[in-house]
């Protein structure tokens, strides 16, 4: 869904780097490893959090139930 706030293994905060990571890959055409090097993500446990993440938030939004009192 969304990137976890911290690395599951070491606890380092990583979520603040997600948008810059996506920008480096999509807009600047960098390889994922190069983007992580530039962001200073050097621990393999933190790198796996980025490399294995699948962003499914947009795909799941149509299936969320409407909230009570909210217009449809």
UniProtKB/Swiss-Prot annotation:
A GO BP annotation: transcription by RNA polymerase I
Keyword Translocase annotated: no
Keywords: Cytoplasm, DNA-directed RNA polymerase, Metal-binding, Nucleotidyltransferase, Transcription, Transferase, Zinc
One of the record's GO cellular component terms: DNA-directed RNA polymerase complex
Keyword presence, Cell membrane: no
Compartments in which it is found: Cytoplasm
One GO MF term: DNA-directed RNA polymerase activity
Catalytic activity: RNA(n) + a ribonucleoside 5'-triphosphate = RNA(n+1) + diphosphate
Binding site for Zn(2+): 7, 10, 45-46
EC number: 2.7.7.6
Cofactor(s) it depends on: Zn(2+)
Signal peptide (residue range): none
Co-factor remark: Binds 1 zinc ion.
Root EC class: transferase
Family recorded in the similarity comment: Belongs to the archaeal Rpo10/eukaryotic RPB10 RNA polymerase subunit family.
Purpose: DNA-dependent RNA polymerase (RNAP) catalyzes the transcription of DNA into RNA using the four ribonucleoside triphosphates as substrates.
Protein name: DNA-directed RNA polymerase subunit Rpo10
